[in-house]
Design a protein with these regions (language model features):
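Extended amphipathic ligand-handling, pore-lining, and cofactor/metal-binding catalytic surfaces
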Residues: 1-127
Length: 127
C-alpha cells in the first residue's frame, strides 16, 4: 500500500504513480511465486484519488478466495498513523470482517540500523 494522491496530479504528469508501480514490480521480481498488488491509501474529500484503493481491495480479497494477506507500505520510511491505524488496525479489521483469516503487516524500516546507514550514505552523497 502506498500513500495516495489525487488523480488530477497523475493526469497532469506527476510521476509518483509510476514510481509506486515500478517499486512493486521490482519487489515482485524478488518473490515470483507470491501475488503482489499495488494499492493506494489515505484518500479524503470528494475528488478521485489513485486506484485501486487499499481499503476496497482488502474488503474484496476474501471473496476472491484470498484469505491470507501480508501488507507492506514501501512508500513509508517510518510507521505512522497511516500504517499503524489505517492499515494494521482498520485494514486488518476490515479484511477479517469480510471473511479473511490471517492478516499481518511488515513494519516500516523505522530505526533499523540498515535504514539509518542508508540514510547516512544518501546524506553524505548529497552534502
Amino acid at each position: 500500500s502506498y500513500h495516495g494522491i489525487p488523480k488530477k496530479y497523475f493526469d497532469k504528469g506527476d510521476p509518483y504513480h509510476c514510481y509506486c508501480h515500478k517499486t512493486t514490480r521490482l519487489i515482485s521480481e524478488k518473490f515470483n511465486s507470491i501475488e503482489i498488488k499495488t494499492t493506494f491509501q489515505s484518500r479524503f474529500g470528494p475528488q478521485k484519488w489513485l486506484e485501486p484503493y487499499t481499503d476496497k481491495t482488502l474488503e474484496s480479497l476474501p471473496s476472491e478466495g484470498k484469505k491470507n494477506v501480508l501488507t507492506i507500505c514501501p512508500g513509508f520510511s517510518s510507521d505512522c498513523v497511516e500504517t499503524l491505524e489505517e492499515i494494521l488496525i482498520e485494514g486488518k479489521d476490515s479484511f477479517l470482517n469480510f471473511g479473511g483469516e490471517n492478516f499481518d503487516m511488515v513494519p516500516c524500516l523505522n530505526d533499523n540500523e540498515d535504514h539509518i546507514s542508508l540514510l547516512k550514505s544518501l546524506i553524505q552523497k548529497n552534502i
